[in-house]
Amino acid sequence: MASTSHNPFYAAMQPQAQHWGATSPTSTGAGYDRPSAGYPAYTGYAAAGTSHPAPSSSSPSTALALYNPSSLYGLYYNEAVHGPFATGLQSNPFTPGLAPLSTVSRPSYATEDPLRQRYPATSANPHDPLNWITEDLFAIRMERAAISQQRTPLRSASVAAR
């Protein structure tokens, strides 16, 4: 993977780094030392002008605050994950059909289903004798089943010939 790390397109296709805790080997993890990562630097309660009650114990708390009081979003806000159209997927500019909200429309065909076009009333009322399955329709369905799921069809040619 190190050989492709120089490629900017490969880096663009990776999910964005979620900076929890220490973001560099030299940081302690108490603060977020990379304000250029897309969110403002964490300022804490004192700089935001709000007061908090004194801790009940003398040991410092290890809870991670996932919000910044002075920002609209939290410390980590990714539009693909937290946005209004959040599917959990990263939109990739090189595969536009796989984007969460794609501008590429699904292809529409003149005949969506040729089987339904040839037999329009087959599934309307199965108890109607006019809709009973004909032999060529059954042959088409067996052909489809044999192609799609490579199993022995229910009525094979050798059994029908006996």
From Swiss-Prot:
Keywords tagged on the record: Hydrolase, Purine metabolism
The reply to whether Hydrolase figures as a keyword in the UniProt entry is yes
The superkingdom listed in its UniProt entry is Eukaryota
Reaction(s) the record says it catalyses: allantoate + H2O = (S)-ureidoglycolate + urea
- Cite the record's tissue specificity text: Expressed in zygote.
A GO term, aspect molecular function: allantoicase activity
Enzyme category, top tier: hydrolase
Biological or metabolic pathway of the protein: Nitrogen metabolism; (S)-allantoin degradation; (S)-ureidoglycolate from allantoate (aminidohydrolase route): step 1/1
pH-dependence annotation: Optimum pH is 6.5 with allantoate as substrate, and 8 with ureidoglycolate as substrate.
> Could you tell me the EC number(s) of this protein?
3.5.3.4
Notes on temperature effects: Optimum temperature is 60 degrees Celsius.
* GO BP, sorted A to Z: allantoin catabolic process; purine nucleobase metabolic process
Q: Which residues form a coiled coil?
A: none
Q: Which family does it belong to?
A: Belongs to the allantoicase family.
This protein's assembly is summarised as: Homohexamer.
Q: What does this protein do?
A: Catalyzes the degradation of allantoate to (-)-ureidoglycolate and (+)-ureidoglycolate to glyoxylate.
What protein name does the entry list?
A: Allantoicase
